[in-house]
Amino acid sequence: MSAPTRKSPPTTLSLRHAFEVEQARREAERYAREEADRRQQEEDLSRAEQLYDALIGDPVFLAAHNLTVDWRRYSVHLESPDFRIRTYFEAGIATITVGDKRNVAVSATPAPLKSEQADSVPEALRIVASFLADEIP
């Protein structure tokens, strides 16, 4: 019984063959990058949703402190008339900022006062709670 034959590269050098191999390699790399980006975006979106769910979990607490929660794709905002705590998820990292709305005369967006980063939703929630404790005595 003979071994299966493998298709071997052409015995003569061919620009066409080399070009087609290179094009296929680049296409495979592009597809792998796009898939990795898509998976990362899905993970970031899921983390934003988890944080949002944690923040809206106690509507009585939110109402007692005049807080609202908003979720926009990769960012979650915890707001009061005086400040905004924003958490933005990108590339597996949560960036949490707090901005003061009391002295916003020029811009509709409060300037960030503090910023921290977190690697997980529980850590992001802890930082949000810390910023909130700084703003609400």
Located regions from the model:
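Charged, low-complexity eukaryotic segments
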Residues: 1-35
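Alpha-helix boundary/N-cap detector
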Residues: 10, 39, 43-46, 50, ...
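C-terminal partner/receptor-binding element of secreted or periplasmic proteins
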Residues: 127-130
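Amphipathic, interaction-prone secondary-structure segments
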Residues: 53, 57-100
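Contiguous, amphipathic alpha-helical segments that mediate oligomerization or scaffolding
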Residues: 22-66
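Intrinsically disordered, low-complexity regulatory segments enriched in Ser/Thr/Pro
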Residues: 82-124, 134-137
